[in-house]
Regions:
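Hydrophobic side chains in well-ordered alpha-helices
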Residues: 158, 182, 216, 295-299
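Glycine-/charge-enriched secondary-structure boundary and capping motifs
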Residues: 2-27, 72, 106-130, 138-145, ...
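Small-aliphatic-rich amphipathic alpha-helix that forms the alpha element of a beta-alpha
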Residues: 73-97, 118-126, 215, 219, ...
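Residue-level signal for inorganic ion chemistry
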Residues: 45, 84, 92, 131, ...
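A short, charged helix-loop
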Residues: 192-211
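Extreme N-terminal cap/leader segments of soluble proteins
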Residues: 1-72, 91, 100, 119-122
Length: 341
């Protein structure tokens, strides 16, 4: 990280150059990381613990795509780190450090970047990692926040996406659909006029501040054959878990829903599509061999995060969600796609 200049701001309320941005607001997030060098070098190093492998994942979030331009900066920062930390949980890994690439359309207000840094500080404290490096720059496009997260897992214990087998039971953590409904609420509050203030607040919180299921990393590492997080919609990510040779028929009534989601569904059955395909849940889908189900459920229970058995993977069937009559539910789209609008 080095010091590029921003356009001069006569009001004095905006950051004057990259050095100020980094050293005043971002460098404190790297305190205690020896390999970060206080964000004064062009590179950083990370020494893995003996007997462990490093795990890497990278997901950017972009204004107008993954968040609203006027979302609170602390919420934007939290979401940027949370969606990456979620990948660590699915791999059975613990977050250690992250790289931040911050592309700004203009020099940020000092109050804005201070709140953004506070959001990162809260998130990294919650997730157990620290900033180790990255870059900042000016872009002609919208605000873009790219994070590469680095985690650690016992050597050979990485949990792949493609390890599931026929007969494995699929578990899902938490509840599904809250974030998609929170997004719909953010766009048009009038759709959810029948919900209470507390119900609306929960849906918005699930959209703005996802909670990566890091407490499940241990049970996943010990007992899962395959796992991934639900980022692009339950149906789409179930198909990813199943792969080309497997499928699963999930009963809609077996999918865990929060009380606000159930209330929204009762008021408007059309939100079912959003629940199944909306994405941004950041819950975990976990394939467990039959002989490990008891141990997995016990271990997951000790984490404090609920998990639910939603079906069994089978050979040569299509992945679908079925209604109470056993009829597959037709969706307008199976999930989120970055290149489909």
């Amino acid at each position: 990280m080095s010091g590029k200049s921003f356009e001069r701001d006569s009001s004095g309320s905006r950051i004057g150059n990259e050095t100020e941005l980094i050293q005043t607001y971002l460098a404190p997030l790297a305190e205690g990381m020896a390999g970060a060098f206080g964000l004064t070098d062009d590179a950083a190093f990370l020494r893995p613990a003996s007997g462990s492998d490093l795990v890497f994942s990278s997901d950017p979030i972009i204004a107008g795509v993954h968040f609203f331009h006027d979302d609170r900066p602390a919420d934007i920062a939290w979401k940027a780190l949370a969606c990456n930390a979620s990948d660590m949980a699915a791999k059975g890994a613990a977050p250690v450090a992250y790289l931040l690439t911050l592309a700004l359309p203009e020099a940020p207000e000092r109050d804005w970047i201070a709140a953004f840094a506070d959001g990162l500080r809260a998130a990294q404290s919650e997730f157990g990692c620290k900033l180790i490096g990255g870059d900042t720059d000016v872009t002609p496009g919208p605000l873009s926040i790219g994070i590469t997260i680095i985690g650690s897992v016992a050597a050979g214990a990485f949990i792949p996406r493609g390890g599931a087998k026929a007969g494995d039971h699929v578990f899902v953590s938490g509840t599904i659909g809250d974030a998609a409904l929170g997004l719909a609420l953010r766009r048009d509050p009038s759709q959810f006029s029948t919900l209470t203030d507390d119900q609306r607040a929960l849906l918005l919180d699930r959209y703005l501040r996802p909670k990566p299921r890091l407490a499940l990393a241990g049970p996943v590492r010990s007992y899962a054959r395959s796992a991934l997080d639900v980022s692009d919609g339950l149906i789409k990510d179930l198909r990813r878990l199943a792969g080309a040779s497997l499928g699963i028929a999930v009963k809609f009534d077996d999918i865990p829903l929060s009380p606000p989601a159930r209330a929204a569904l009762a008021a408007n059955p059309n939100v079912r599509d959003s629940i199944l395909a909306g994405g941004d849940d950041y819950e975990l889908l976990i394939a467990v061999a039959p002989e490990n189900i008891g141990k997995f459920v016990t271990s997951a229970g000790e984490s404090g995060i609920p998990v639910y058995d939603i079906g069994v993977l089978e050979s040569k069937i299509t992945t679908v969600v079925v209604d109470p009559s056993g009829v597959p539910i037709a969706l307008r789209r199976p999930g989120y796609d970055h290149f489909s609008r």
